[in-house]
Amino acid sequence: MVKISLARSLLIAGLAYVAFEARAFAQEGLVLTELENHVSAAAKGWETTILDAAKSLFWILATIEIGIAAVWLALQAASLDSWFAELVRRIMFVGFFAFVLTQGPTFARAVIDSLFQIGAGGGSASPAEIFDAGIRVASQMSQQAQFGVFEDNALAIAAVLAMGVVVICFSLVAAIFVSVMVEMYVGLLAGMIMLGLGGSSFTKDFAVRYLVYAFGVGMKLMALVMIAKIGSQVLLGLANAPTASSDQFVTTLAIAGISVVVFIIAMYVPSIIQGVVQGASVSGGMETIRHGGQAASFAAGAGFLAGGAARTGFTAGQSARAAGSSLAGAALRGFGAGIGSASSAAGSAAKEKAIGSPGAYAGSILGLANAKLDESRGGHSGHKPPPERKD
């Protein structure tokens, strides 16, 4: 009774938190926008200092470049035509990279903004909007979280778990978005010093790499925005689609699984695209497949754990009803037993995983939790010890 009362109290507190803090979750998305604005303002404050240092470096290298060319022509005893041709070539070289130095940061930001708009489909996109998309999906799924005697409690438990997975995954995607935006501001700012290396023919490749880097960051942002928008649209479509009662449980688990897949794709694919643009291999395909398999295993384990908890709760409710309890009391007791058994199994699995118990090393936490839930439902708490040897 103590465990059931504790589980019931935790359940009521959790539902109250979800109900009354939805607006607070939505407001937290604005913090990401404020963070982006602060980083942008701080980066602009350093732009003049770094650009002045890049200009000084550029003209020092340009002077050395012209001096070396003049000494080389003098040693070769070149004619007046050779002097004039070399002078024109050096002036064109220095003039072009001087233009890149002054207009390069503006051009780089224009390229990134253009690719960003392409990824956003001509609309707007920000970390706060991605976070709010996850909140909208979770809010739509909350309509399925209806507990009661005549309600589908298994579907309600799955909906609550899926809501948490969706909010966490989209929060992480928004965090990735913020990190890419910070990389863009800081990378383009610090990379401006590379434009100063365009004053010499020996170091001009560094200035070109700055423009390539800007294009790579733009492609990374475009891919990330496209993934986030497509993923949110698919999840909203699944959450809003009218389905039969027999399919709602599968759809709920599918939403949780797809949100994990969106997070994994948002973590790896934009970096791979940036690496292709810059000519570097960032990640292998097998690494992405491995993490995708881990995400799928996590989603499947969570689904089986929710189903096992629902079965345990149903059995406890039937027992309470047979003992003479009312329908409401039996439903609450069954639901409390389901939540309590799932929480106890997950906590015990996490403890064994943390302390490295025998047999827990090769399995995951959710796998161990499902095994413990099956054992408790079967009426035994662990594996039977082997018989003692009698020598």
Swiss-Prot record:
Residues 372-391 are annotated as: Disordered. It is a multi-pass membrane protein. The keyword Membrane applies. Its main location: membrane. InterPro entries: Conjugal_tfr_TrbL, Conjugal_tfr_TrbL/VirB6. Keywords: Cell membrane, Conjugation, Membrane, Plasmid, Transmembrane, Transmembrane helix. GO terms for cellular component: plasma membrane. Pfam families: TrbL. It is found in: Cell membrane. One of its GO terms (biological process) is protein secretion by the type IV secretion system. NCBIfam families: PRK13841.1, TrbL_P. Belongs to the TrbL/VirB6 family. This is Probable conjugal transfer protein TrbL. The lineage of its organism: Bacteria, Pseudomonadati, Pseudomonadota, Alphaproteobacteria, Hyphomicrobiales. The gene is trbL.
